[in-house]
Amino acid sequence: MSDKSKIMEWIAEAETTADASTMDIPKRAYNDRLVAWIDTLAMRNKMRESDDAEEIFTIMGRLQNYVENACENLVAKGKLNYLQISDGFIIVADLDCVNELCEILCQIQWQVLFYSQMLLRGALTAGKVSMSDDSKLIIGPAFIEAFAMESENAIFPRILFANEIKDYIKEDEIVFSYLKKDSDHFIYLDFLKYMIDKEQITTKELKHFLQTQGVKRLLVEGYSKNILKSKHLAQKHGWLIARFAEYKIKLS
């Protein structure tokens, strides 16, 4: 047999083997899931301005701990997965976890504000998504929608609750009672009211907590420093100051 014939035989054998192995691999499919994207504000500027890599890694690790601790029960049940991308997180959960996921997102937002003195915003939606077997890659239109909502519509330190969720979940199954419509008609998770009620925090205790944790300083200075040079930044702090005012907590 000529060398050319041998080569053609090898190619044919390789193609046959490849076809057979491909047939054994199930095709990946999109599934309907809840998808949240949350992201801290001003972290990019901190990374640009800081030459201390250890400081940035410490912040990232702290954020990861908040998410890991809040999600651990649903992760253990195989009903939730998450992926950290820099200072942002994609969280994917089963549709029947809508109430638990809302609570998880509120807890994370509270911890980021009070224990890391950072603002967080995001979006929660539902739709088609697919994750790799090792959970290191997430794709799908629902993730794109959550990311777009956070970057284009959230604006303030709030986590939006998409109307699309009700296309996948019956309205009477959504019993989380801390959904609030903002002045621009977007629905968001009222994490302050949720945590105040859950922890039974009094107004006096909350005022003390805001002072001792540095949150009051963060918001007041963030607003006053930016009101003249960057209204876009000032309004983020101002929005949260106004939310505290709704619960009789005057910061400015």
Question: For each of these PLM feature ranges, what is it?
Answer:
Residues 46, 131, 144:
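Short, electropositive, low-hydrophobicity segments enriched in small/polar residues
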Residues 58, 103, 140-147:
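A general alpha-helical scaffold signature found inside nucleotide-binding enzyme cores
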Residues 37, 119-125, 158-162:
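A structural signal for short, well-ordered beta-strand segments and their strand-loop junctions
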Residues 115-117, 143-165:
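Catalytic/regulatory signature loops of cyclic-dinucleotide turnover enzymes
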Residues 72-100, 112-141:
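Catalytic core of nucleotidyl cyclases, primarily class III adenylyl/guanylyl cyclases
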Residues 3, 7-103, 107:
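Catalytic NTP-binding/metal-coordinating core of nucleotidyl cyclase/transferase enzymes
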Residues 106-110, 134, 144-148:
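Short secondary-structure capping micro-motifs at structural edges
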Residues 2-25, 155-252:
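Intrinsically disordered, glycine/charged-rich C-terminal tails and inter-domain linkers
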